[in-house]
UniProtKB/Swiss-Prot annotation:
InterPro entries per the UniProt record, alphabetical: C-type_lectin-like (IPR001304), C-type_lectin-like/link_sf (IPR016186), C-type_lectin/snaclec_domain (IPR050111), C-type_lectin_CS (IPR018378), CTDL_fold (IPR016187)
The keyword Secreted is annotated on this UniProt entry: yes
Main location: secreted
Name of the gene: INGAP
Name of the protein described by the UniProt record: Pancreatic beta cell growth factor
Reported induction: Found 1 and 2 days after cellophane wrapping, absent by the 6th day. This period coincides with islet neogenesis.
Gene Ontology terms for molecular function: carbohydrate binding
Domain named C-type lectin: residues: 38-175
Disulfide feature: 40-51, 68-171, 146-163
Keywords attached to this entry: Disulfide bond, Lectin, Secreted, Signal
Residues of the signal peptide: 1-26
Amino acid sequence: MMLPMTLCRMSWMLLSCLMFLSWVEGEESQKKLPSSRITCPQGSVAYGSYCYSLILIPQTWSNAELSCQMHFSGHLAFLLSTGEITFVSSLVKNSLTAYQYIWIGLHDPSHGTLPNGSGWKWSSSNVLTFYNWERNPSIAADRGYCAVLSQKSGFQKWRDFNCENELPYICKFKV
């Protein structure tokens, strides 16, 4: 039979563990929600610790990337999770854009010379560890070396596209 003091200590430890776990779980779920902790410039929206701005003035991929760097000290959006893609998708859909494609920061500077599509990189230099292709770019007949979100996929999947086309784009930046 346990002594009352031992039982009390065990109850306290269990309560402490449960409180810690709920705090950790709460922290994790907060990372996935749009953040109200940061204030973005007018016309931009916060998600996590970044601001996102959808620019509807069409540019080539290179000019769009330069624009994100010059105006926001950021990059074309680099999408690292399904939660982030869902957020960006809703941002694009809510803009009522008539465009079928939106530039993101993914590109293949090797122009397909590396095997198995391994040349694809984020313009921000973030490591490409999450893949969400609408179609495999390394076997497409009409290859492009810059990536877009496509309306066909609900702006949730990536597709390779000709970098010289002029399209709207999404910038991602910190404030």
